[in-house]
Amino acid sequence: MGLFDKKYCDICGEKIGLLGNRKLENGNLCKNCAKKLSPWFSDRRNSTVDEIKAQLAYREENQGKVAAFHTTRTLGTDTKVLFDEDAGKFMVTRARNLVEANPDVLDFADVTGCNLDIDERRSELEREDEDGNKISYNPPRYEYSYDFYITIFVNNPYFDEMRFKINSDSVDVTPPPAMRPGMATRYDPESNVEYRNCKKLGEEIRQMLTQVRKDVRERIEQAAAPKAAITCPYCCATTTPDASGRCEYCGGALNG
């Protein structure tokens, strides 16, 4: 086929415009269908048509989960982590219209880890000498820029991590000059209020996700643990409590 031959989307069958093709491993995808994929998905070019169809079915099912989602806690300012603690689910999004954005709804049990990373960049400050040339300070002075990133590692068939920036704008810090010329001083970014606030938010998100994962794992382990046989106080039978904590013979409530 020629470069400018007509192409059709292998998902919806619609004609693809000149700049609208999104290549798949064995086919073509239009930009409208591509928009429906998960925002955390990044392996489109290596995906087959059938794999994309399966993901779009998953995304359509996700719309029902978004509709049923009841936010009980929100962490974040720009990109937010929304929790439905009653249902044991969460989502990450910066969208205001959740129905339109259709952010992936995940179970607490899907979380496998969570990291907070602080990206530091520095650039040297210079001054002009008597001849107008830019020269370094003695000792050299720098200004710093910080960005704060959360990475949530998850079990999901279409992506294994969700990485996003906490702060909408970089935190820029210019330390004061040294008290004595020629003597270097150490600067602690923790003395900057904005830096501290961003780090605190990141730690809160990380701790929350780490805790809910721990709670889920503990419940799974408890459910899998063998239950000890006890004597029912009502029928005197030796019984193992059922899922409701009742005697398997007479149905009496057991405290053991």
Protein language model features and the residues they cover:
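Short cysteine-rich clusters marking metal-coordination/redox-active sites
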Residues: C9-C12, C30-C33, C232-C235, C247-C250
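Short, non-ligating residues that shape and space the ligands of small metal-coordination modules
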Residues: L18-L19, P39-W40, P241-D242, G256
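Short linker/helix segments within small regulatory modules
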Residues: L19-N28, T240-R246
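Acidic, Ser/Thr- and proline-rich intrinsically disordered linker/docking segments
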Residues: C114-P226
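Short Cys/His-rich micro-motifs in 6-15 aa windows
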Residues: G27-D43, C250-G256
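Phosphoinositide-binding peripheral membrane targeting modules
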Residues: A87-I135
